[in-house]
A protein has these predicted regions:
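A beta-strand edge to alpha-helix "cap/lid" segment located at domain peripheries
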Residues: 1-25, 35-128
Length: 128
């Protein structure tokens, strides 16, 4: 993993790393107590819960593509909003396609890395 010393790099590298399917590398993008919205109304908090939630997506052998995105940075906090599509294969062998607009919060760490604190891939879509 390349150093994620800017929120833009963190977001782009996260998408790339997700497609590689390495759960440990993916989890390295999150703070230990981060929250991940696995589906609307279901929030996974902390590394163990994130591992289970992300593994659910990885079981689809997905390809995750990032569309247009916007970053807003205020000091050590960043808000990222990005469109995404995911294509994979369900347990029944049928094609699966999902799309959404993620709303994420990242925080600069003491060592300069930017990590996800909140990852809500359904964020913008929840507003209707």
């Amino acid at each position: 993993m390349i150093p994620v010393n800017s929120p833009e790099t963190a977001v782009r590298e996260f998408f790339k790393t997700f497609n590689e399917g390495n759960i440990e590398a993916i989890l390295a993008f999150y703070e230990p107590k981060a929250a991940f919205v696995a589906q609307p109304g279901q929030v996974a908090e902390g590394t163990a819960a994130l591992r289970a939630a992300v593994n659910g997506f990885l079981s689809l052998k997905p390809t995750l593509t990032m569309g247009p995105y916007q970053l807003v940075v205020a000091g050590d906090i960043a808000l990222s909003v990005a469109k995404w599509t995911l294509q994979g294969t369900g347990p029944d062998g049928k094609a699966v396609q999902m799309e959404g607009a993620t709303t994420d919060v990242l925080r600069r760490q003491v060592d300069g890395r930017w990590l996800f604190v909140i990852d809500n891939p359904w964020g913008v879509g929840l507003l209707g």
